[in-house]
Amino acid sequence: MNKSTAALLCLLLLCSSTGVRADDLMENDDLAPSADLGELPPPVGQQALIDQNGQANLALLSQNGQSLLGRIVQSGSNQEAYILQQGSDLMALITQNGSGNAASITQNGSHNRAQISQNGNNNDASIEQAGTGLQSAVTQSGNGMSVSVKQYR
């Protein structure tokens, strides 16, 4: 075997092994999951809890942002509760005991806190917050009460 043939075989061998190494990198088995630079990191601290005991209760909780806490607890029947949060560092809590109660909390902004507690029947309460650093709490004990709180800053 002459030198040129041996050099050509060595070059062919090196080129073919380089292709295998590049192909192996395409599998990405050695990378951690979600390490793709094209993905956004998951939102920080979104927590939602809905706990229902009874019949015909309706609850809706929608969150968009970071560091959000939403909690709905219903005991009884025919109750409605809605929480909509958009922003950062928001907390909304709704607790309902009885029948036919309706409650809603809407929060836009940051660092807001809202709480509705209903004990009784056919009560209606709503809290709407838009801005920063707002706090509101509503407690209804009895029947047929209605309240609406709107805070803007």
Each language-model region and where it sits:
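Bacterial N-terminal signal peptides
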Residues: 9-16
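Low-complexity repeat regions of mature extracellularly deployed or surface/particle-associated proteins
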Residues: 23-153
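Intrinsic disorder/low-complexity segments
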Residues: 7-8, 93
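Bacterial N-terminal signal peptides that target proteins for export
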Residues: 1-7
